[in-house]
Each structure stands twice: as C-alpha cells, then as structure tokens.
UniProtKB/Swiss-Prot annotation:
Component of the cleavage factor IA (CFIA) complex, which is involved in the endonucleolytic cleavage during polyadenylation-dependent pre-mRNA 3'-end formation and cooperates with the cleavage factor NAB4/CFIB and the cleavage and polyadenylation factor (CPF) complex. Transmembrane segments: none annotated. It comes from the Eukaryota. Its main location: nucleus. GO terms for molecular function: mRNA binding. This is mRNA 3'-end-processing protein RNA14. The lineage of its organism: Eukaryota, Fungi, Dikarya, Ascomycota, Saccharomycotina. It is found in: Nucleus; Cytoplasm. The keyword Nucleus applies. HAT repeats lie at residues 56-88, 90-124, 138-170, 181-214, 257-289, 298-330.
C-alpha cells in the first residue's frame, strides 16, 4: 500500500494558521505561539477561537477550527461548537460543508451531541408551517438517521428520545388516514426505543403504557405484553451498564466560555486518566459479551460506537487507540485509525510501531521510514524545548526538569533503536546503517543504548564482531564515564570471550566511572568473570582492589556474588536465605540495575488494584461526614435561610445536574493559574 492511501488532512491550508502574520499582535499572537509550541493543546485552540469571536474575526475562527480538525478529526465537541457558532450567525452554506466533513467518509463522527446539532439544522431548514407534510417527512428521516447512527447505542440518550417523541406527538393530523399513520409511527418508535438500555427508560415505559390505554384499552394489553419482556431486559442491562461504568467521566464544554482542563482531555498518565481508561475498557469488554443478543453486524456497530466514544474522551491514550485499531480487521482501515491516532499523539512509540507494522505488511518501506521520521522529529523538538527551558532557568524545579530531559532522551533513543532494527528487517543492513548515521549526528542527545543496539545488530547480521567493536569504541568517546555503558560493553566482550579486550576496557574505565553503584557492578562483573574463566589469584587481586575502594562492603556479599549462576545468587537463595532478596535478584538478572527506570508503565492488574484502592470514580474511600464536621459560617448562614423542601410540591432545582455542571464546566481558579494568567 503506498503512502498516498493514507488519509489526507482535512484542510490543506491549515498549516498557514500556525505561522503568525505581521498584522497579528497582542493576545492573538500569544495564543498562536502557544499553539505553535504545543499543537496538541486543545484548550489553547479554544481560547484562541474565543478571542477571535470577540473580535468578530470569523474568517480566522474558521481557519483555526480547520487547523484543529486536522489534528483532532474525531474530537466531536469541537465540531459541535463550530456548528453552533455558524448556526447562530445563520451561515447555512458553511454549516452544510462542515456537516459533510464530520458526518461522512472515513472521519465520520458518531457523537450524539454532534448529530443532534445536525438535527437542529434540519429542523431549522424545514419549517413545518410552510413546508407541511414534505418538511415533516424530511425531519422524520433525520430523526431516524440519528437514531441509527448513535442513539440506539448510547446509554445516555434520553434527550434525543424525548425530542423525537415530542415531535411525533405534536403532529396534528388533518384526517383519519394521517391519524392512523401517526399512531403507527408512534408505536414503531416506542417499539425501537423501549428495547434500548438508556437513562429515563422507566419513565418512557410508563408514558408508553398510558398512551396505549388512551389509544385503545382493548388492544393495549396485547401491545404492552409484546414489548414487556424486551423492556425488562433493557432496564436490567442499563442498570448493569451503570455498575460497569461507575465513575465514567464524559464531560465536554457546552460553549467556548466553559472550556477548561476539567472538561477537555488532558495528556499524561495520571491516576485519573488510568482509572478512566480502565472504565472504558470495562465498558468495551461488557459490550463484547453481547448481552443484547444483537446480530453480528449490529454488535460490530455498537462496539465501534463505544470505541469512537472512547478515543474522543481518551484522545491522548495510546492504549485506547491501539485497542480500537486491533478491533478493526482490515489492514487499510487499521492504518487510517492509527494514522489519525498519531495526529493527536505524534510522539507515541507504540502507535508509531504499530502503524509501521501495517505499512510493512504492504511492503511500503517509504511509509515505514516516514512514520518513524515523524515520531523522532517530534521527540527531538520536545527535547530541545525542554533543554531550552532548563538552560534558561525558567523552571525552578531543576531536578524534575533534568529527569524529564533524560526521559526524553531515553524515549528518542528507544524509537531510533526500533527504527534501525525495523529497517534492517525490511531493507537490509544498508538501510539500518543509514538510520544509525542519523543517530550519530545527534551525538550526546541520544543515550548509549543506540550504540549497544547497533553493535548487536552488526554482530547478528553476519557474526561481524569487528564492526561491532568499532561501534562500541565510537560510543566510548561519548560515554567513557557512564558505568551503565561500560557494563554493557563488558557484557558484549564477555559474550564473545575477548579476554584481553575485557581487561583493557576494565583498566581504562575503572578510574573514570563516577557512579559508585555502577562501579561496584563493574568490579563484581570482573570478579565473577575471573572466577569462571580466569584464575583465583586474579580474583583475589580484584577483590583486594574492590575492598580498598569500598571498605564498607560485606565480605560474604561479594563472595556470594561471584558464584552466581545465570545472574542468580544461589548461595543466598539456597543457603543464606536471610540475605536473599528475590525482587533484587530478578531485577538484576533481567539486565536492569542501570539506575534509570524506563518510562512509566502500569499493567492492567496494577490498574485494577489502583481502582480498588481509590474506587471506580477515582476518589478515595467515601467516608460520611461526621456530624461535628466544621462548615464555613457562610454556608451555615445560607442553609439557615433557605426554605425547607417540604414547602415545595416539585423540585425547582435538580441538585445532581447542578453538581455535574459545577464539576464539568466550572474551573475554580488556583493561586498558580491566577499568577500565570
């Protein structure tokens, strides 16, 4: 498959938006620069759009939306906000173009709020007073389309069903034929709706039974009986779904003013993001069980709907995108999903690797190379940005920034290593050496791993240890003080049984390595080597030097370590069991112990444990407030003057909706945000 089959960006002109022009100043310039620095910061786009709308620069608003959709084509709330803005200005021609882009083709969105906006547009364009029966038919078709696309799959769809039902009930027929047609349509509507597990289902059932009684009390029992079993099943499944998805957050801004970090997806692997990801995966697992007994085609549509909802709210989760792509069976469709995923996550190694595999299956080496190049360029740009911040001293937390910088180096090196091995697999050693040539230009930016990886690649290719030695010697120029690199170099030499070179490397490096932990490992490695393949006098000589350097070390500790078998300390394990540390043993036997841990990783079992500790909703165990818990005086004063609830026959305020609104749409300013603002 050629690279031309990869889905094009929606708007070819979008890149122009990122470059500020000469006539842009002040807040607009600052917001554009923020987007340029971080093209995946959703909130920055919305802040810029909101600013441009206050300036009534609607042409610029459309340009920024275009740029945004190029990066996040499946983020439906942005399409919805844009459509609502255009509808408010009666820009119907623009609305039609936007609807064609976001509701059809490979980038079709399936969000109910977005489709409801489409429904609003259809109802505005088809006036029942002037259009009559023809307009009603068009609107009914639109309702049915929205129902088929997403409403029948969405558990939180009561607003749609209410709107559809009210529309049918408001129909005033002119004759008996139209009256019968209306009854048939309502009955068909109820039949479809009451089989769907969704919120407010019980109220709809009561409404239906009352309606049947009003239409014909003689036939009511028959029709109600036919639907009763399906309704009971749907009601039970909705309750089950609520339990499975307890704590799921699906907040999105209702307008540009309410957009904040609480209702917009945020990158990173925070506890909250991990918990939300697990809930989404639980939902998908539940759908796969097919408790609704759907046909294979309908089940596939329903699962796809949930996946698309998942990637909308977990847009920065590589695992969610990966799972969705693996659910797709066709390689070309999988490529489209992964390509779109990398628009929002251009620095994701896992998504890059998976997309490159898809291209490799089509023997498209050019696309494989382009895929890796985009990822490495993104990671390199991020590294330079972090390094610039560290050097300028903008962040006081220098230690944290240094750690972040090293993590970025690790990540970039890791991708280059996989890139190199992939090109060797696809196009041979020459292509791999080309990639290594790119790595050499980066010198100290990359970690030593790229030299070690290339050395093994050269050796495995045709047992060419001479080239491998040259590579490792080249790495020694930059990492001669790095104990981790020296240890790995020694491992390679020991593997090839190059005795003289082993001893030379040890003697030239032992005084240069500053990290005492790694220096200990180098000594112990040499002691173990001499114990197995050298002579006892050399062992004693090395031990003497070791204890002169580390006099506090335990004698028997060093003794047991030189009798390790396959990196396992069996003396401790089998005899001196009180000294044995299984975790430490397995850690070092797996080739770790370099003092730098890899990127953050959490298994599904760890996620489950974390959720059990914090609860599905991400809060720690909910303890009831004590009766004597202190409340602010202002709150107590307010409670004392509010009328008691028994004075009102109906609820004037839905407390839960108010709480949800405050949680999702209102961001309470912090001291830090006030200062930065």
């Amino acid at each position: 498959m050629s690279s031309s089959t990869t889905p094009d960006l929606l708007y070819p002109s979008a890149d122009k938006v990122a470059e500020p022009s000469d006539n842009i100043h002040g807040d607009e310039l600052r917001l554009r620069e923020r987007i340029k620095d971080n093209p995946t910061n959703i909130l920055s786009y919305f802040q810029l759009i909101q600013y441009l709308e206050t300036q009534e620069s609607y042409a610029k608003v459309r340009e920024v939306y275009e740029q945004f959709h190029n990066t996040f084509p499946f983020y439906s709330p942005a399409w919805t906000l844009q459509l609502k803005g255009e509808l408010a200005r009666d820009e119907f021609e623009t609305v039609e173009k936007i609807l064609a882009q976001c509701l059809s083709g490979k980038l079709e969105n399936n969000d109910l709020s977005l489709w409801s906006t489409y429904l609003d547009y259809i109802r505005r364009k088809n006036n029942l007073i002037t259009g009559g029966q023809e307009a009603r038919a068009v609107i009914v078709k639109a309702f049915q389309l929205v129902m088929q696309k997403c409403a029948i799959f969405e558990p939180k769809s009561s607003s749609f069903w209410n709107e559809y039902l009210n529309f049918l009930e408001q129909w005033k027929p002119f004759n008996k034929w139209e009256e019968q047609q209306r009854i048939d349509m309502l009955r068909e509507f109820y039949k479809k709706m009451l089989c769907v597990p969704f919120d407010n289902l019980e109220k709809m059932w009561n409404r239906y039974t009352q309606w049947e009684q009003e239409i014909n009390s003689l036939t009511a029992r028959k029709f109600i009986g036919e639907l009763s079993a399906e309704y009971m099943k749907a009601r039970s499944l909705y309750q089950e779904w609520l339990n499975v998805t307890n704590g799921l957050k699906r907040a999105s801004p209702i307008n540009l003013r309410t957009a904040n970090k609480k209702n917009i997806p945020q990158p990173g692997t925070s506890d909250s993001n991990i918990q939300q990801l697990q809930i989404w995966l639980n939902w998908i697992k539940w759908e796969r069980e097919n408790k609704l007994m759907l046909s294979e085609d309908m089940l596939s549509q329903r699962i796809s709907y949930v996946y698309k909802q998942g990637i909308q709210y977990m847009i920065f989760s590589a695992e969610m995108w990966y799972d969705y792509s693996m659910y797709i069976s066709e390689n070309s469709d999988r490529q489209n999903i992964l390509y779109t995923a990398l628009l929002a996550n251009p620095d994701s190694p896992s998504l890059t690797f998976k997309l490159s595999e898809c291209y490799e299956l089509d023997n498209d080496s050019e696309s494989v190379s382009n895929c890796f190049d985009k990822c490495t360029q993104t990671l390199l740009s991020q590294y330079k940005k972090i390094a610039s911040d560290v050097n300028s001293g903008e962040d006081n937390n220098t230690e944290y920034e240094q750690e972040l910088l090293y993590k970025q180096r690790e990540k970039l090196t890791f991708v280059f290593c996989v890139y190199m091995n992939t090109m060797k697999r696809i196009s041979g050693l020459s292509a791999a050496r080309t990639v290594f040539g790119k790595c050499r230009k980066l010198k100290r930016i990359l970690t030593h791993d790229v030299y070690v990886e290339n050395a093994y690649l050269e050796f495995q290719n045709q047992n060419d240890y001479k080239t491998a030695f040259k590579v490792l010697e080249l790495g020694l120029k930059y990492f001669q003080n790095d104990g981790v690199y020296i240890n790995k170099y020694l491992d390679f030499l020991i593997f090839l049984n190059k005795d003289s070179q082993i001893k030379t490397l040890f003697e030239t490096s032992v005084e240069k390595v500053q990290d005492l932990t790694q220096l200990k490992e180098i000594y112990k490695k040499m002691i173990s080597y001499e114990s197995k393949f050298g002579n006892l006098n050399n062992v004693y000589s090395l031990e003497k030097r070791f204890f002169e350097r580390f006099p506090q070390e335990n004698l028997i500790e060093v003794f047991t370590s030189r009798y390790q078998i396959q990196n396992s300390n069996l003396i401790k394990k089998l005899e001196l069991t009180y000294m044995y540390n299984e975790e430490e043993d397995s850690y070092f036997s797996s080739g770790n112990g370099d003092g730098h841990h890899g990127s953050y990783n959490m298994s599904s079992s760890d996620r489950k444990r974390l959720m059990e500790e914090t609860g599905n909703n991400g809060n720690f165990s909910n303890k009831k407030f004590k009766r004597d818990s202190e409340l602010p005086t202002e709150v107590l004063d307010l409670l004392s003057v509010i009328p008691k609830r028994q004075y009102f026959n109906t609820n004037l305020l839905d407390a839960q909706k108010l709480v949800n609104f405050l949680n999702d749409q209102v961001e309470i300013p912090t001291v830090e945000s006030t200062k930065s603002g």
